[in-house]
Each structure stands twice: as C-alpha cells, then as structure tokens.
Amino acid sequence: MWHNMAMTRLWFRCGLAVFLLVLAGSAFAAPRLERERCTFKPPRGDRIECFTLIVPENREQPEGREVRLKVAVLKAKRTVGAEPLIYLSGGPGDAPLMASSPGADALAEGDWWNETAAIRRRRDVVILSQRGAGGATPNLDCFDPRTTDPAKARRRAVTEQQERDILVRCRAGLDKRKIDLAMYTTPALADDVSDLASAMSLAKINIYGVSYGTRWGLEVMRRYPDLVRAAVLDGVYPPQVNGEQNEPEIVRQAFEQLYAECTADPLCRERHPGLRSAVEGKIDAAERAPVELTLQLEDGPHPVRLDGSKFLMVLLHMMREGEAALIPETVAAVQRGDVRLLKMFAEDLESNDGGLLEQNAQQFDGLYNSIECRETWATVDRAARRKMIETSGVYGFNARTSKSPAFCPVWRVPAAPATERQPVKAAVPTLLLSGTFDWLTPPAWGREAARY
C-alpha cells in the first residue's frame, strides 16, 4: 500500500513537472507585450502608450533567440472599441519610431499627431517596428567602423571596396552573434503583425502600408486573411513584381508622362517646347561636366558634384515629392546658369534620403540587404538588366549606380521560394493608391495588384 502511494506521489510529481515545463515553454513561445516608458511627447489632449513586442526570431525554434520590437499606440480621442489601424512602414528598413538625431522626437519629426488626427477620432493608430531595423533588437544596421554616428558615416568618402569590406565585417559580426539572417524576411514581418494582434487581443485589424509596407501588408493578407478588416496600400509594391529588373524602363515611363503632360498644357508647351531634348541633354551634359553645388545641410555646407546619375536622382526626387511640374523650369534655369531650384531640391533629397554626397549609411542597412537580396536580386536576370541600362541612355543612369549586385553575394541569404512571388488573392476590402510620377512604385504596379 505504501509502495503504491509512493509511486502515485512520484507519478504526480513527474506529471506536474512535465506540465510546468510545457506551460513554461508555451508561455515563452507566446508573443507578449511589455509596457515601457514613452520618450515621445504628445500634444496637449493626446495620449500615447509604448510597448515592446517580444517574439521568437525563428518561430520553428521558439526556445531560441528573441526579437524585441518597439510599438507605439497613438490613442483614439474616444474609446469606442473600433479596430485599430496598424501602420506598416517602407524601406525595407524604415524606422518611424527612431529620431534622426539623439534627443529628438521621432513622432514630432514625422508630424504623426497631425497626420493621424482624423483616424484617431475613433481608432488607435499602432506603429510597429520592423524586425532587424531601427527600434528593434537585434538591429542589423552596419556603419563605417571609423564612426558609430550614422550622420558622420553618411558624410565620409569611402570606395566601393571599402563599402564591401564593411559589409563583410558586419556579416561576420552577425554570424558571431548567431543571428539568423534567413529569419528577417517579409513573411516573418507578417507573422510579427499577427503576433502583435494576438498580444493585444485583437480579432480584427486595419492596415496602412506605404511603399515596401504595401508588400508587407499584402503578405499579412495572404497569411492571415481573417485578421485584416480593411487595408490601404499606398505606393503598391506587389510580390510578383521585380522592380530592379526593368528600372530604366520604369524611369523612362515616368519622364514620358511628364513630357506628355507638358505637351498637353498650353502654358508648359509654350514655355518649354523642347522639354525632352532639354532634360536628356542636361543630364547627359552633367555626366560629362558635373554641376557643382554647395549644399547647406544641418551640419554645415557640403560641396557636391552632380554628375548625370545624381542630376537624374534630383529630378526623380522631385517627382516623388509631388513637384514634377517644376522640373521643366528647374532644367531651363540650369541651362541659363541659375541653379537655385536645383540646389533647393538637392538639399531636400540629401537631408531626407541621402545619396548625393560621397556616401550614406542607408546602403549599410542590414534588413534592406536581407530582404532585397533574398526577394528581389535573387531572381534578377543581370545580363538582361545590364543590356537595358546600356540601351536606355540617360534613363539608365540611376540603375547603373546600384551597389546591390556587388553586395548581395557578401550578404549571403537564401533566395525566397517561388510561392512568395505569387500574387496575393484576398477578399479584403482594399484601397490601392499610386502616384502618377512615383517611379519607385509606379501606377502599373497598382493595376497589377488589383488584377487579383
């Protein structure tokens, strides 16, 4: 009898131990939110809550490394229980919760409170960091080892071989930390959104994706169609599209639209009758004799030489910023020796995106490399792309400057399976937005996504 009772107690203890282990394991694997102190300063009358979302790096190994993602909830004016709007940022690698300089307020910099005021009348707006980007741990960003200040790294002149060496060291450092770059993908980011909804006890969400964030949002809709109540996709970038393959033709089409609209407008046609030849001629002339400017930036004046590629970059930036109508006058002014308009837009481009000075930290963005090398460059026909660049005249100058063909072999990530490149078919009410002159996500891509 005592033997049976002892055995019963033993089995009970063993069973309890196993149960507790299973419970602990499942609790560890489950996504969870931890409240944290907000560093953002909302305007009077507005409220914000800040959290860290904790999820597994590899969901097939939930006991392994954790990923920590910043979350900001801009609270609705009224608590009515409406499904929140989750903002999906672009890039990949954009970090809307990270300020451009220490001590600054990222939400104030992005004018988030004003931009979301109408939505927040009855819905919370939730901003989620991208895994691997700013605001997340681990962060895959790499900077020039001569400085840890991104702004200074951005101003340093480095050769392409030095850039490559930086990435080699960065990749080796990530390997040493046992960070699995194969887990920093669009599907993994989509799973993070689902885990966020689960941790917030949300049965339904609305999503607003911008640029790359539209591809992120489409993947959420593919993987979790019952989770998404409605979606707005702004600057549509569907998974079946490879933007790098035909970039020169996309750039050409944006300018063809500009030429056509100028011809159709009596005033533009009268003032700029030879717009095509003026634009192409000035870009080509800058390639042979760069336009010299001094940009007035936050950290002081910086001389820059705009060759054909950089001159084209400024014009493309004007298109994306809704200033395409000023391109004819900007080019005409430069022909007269007046570079004031060109300088103004060059300063705006360098301040916001970089790319005109010798170097900028964007190309050391590890998450960008991980996703673009895996999902885009792995399927690019490089010989066909080179031929298109060579035969596209000035419209191929921008594509010619891409470093990804040289950097992706260094980054060493596996190619995405073909299933991820299939169109997304989801019965979710969706508003697709595309800018007429948005050459990075042209209107044709929105029409392509709408077919499904």
Residue ranges of predicted features:
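Catalytic-loop region of hydrolases
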Residues: 26-157, 276-287, 412-416
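Short beta-strand/loop motif that positions the catalytic acidic residue
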Residues: 426, 432-434
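Alpha/beta-hydrolase fold active-site neighborhood
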Residues: 280-425
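Short beta-strand immediately N-terminal to the catalytic nucleophile in serine-hydrolase-like folds
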Residues: 207-209, 234, 433
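Conserved alpha/beta-hydrolase "acid-adjacent" motif
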Residues: 439-445
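Conserved acidic catalytic loop of the alpha/beta-hydrolase fold
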Residues: 175, 190-205
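A catalytic-pocket lid/entrance helix-loop region that shapes and gates access to the active site
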Residues: 114, 141-151, 217-282, 313, ...
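Glycine-rich nucleophile elbow surrounding the catalytic serine of serine-hydrolase chemistry
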Residues: 191, 209-221
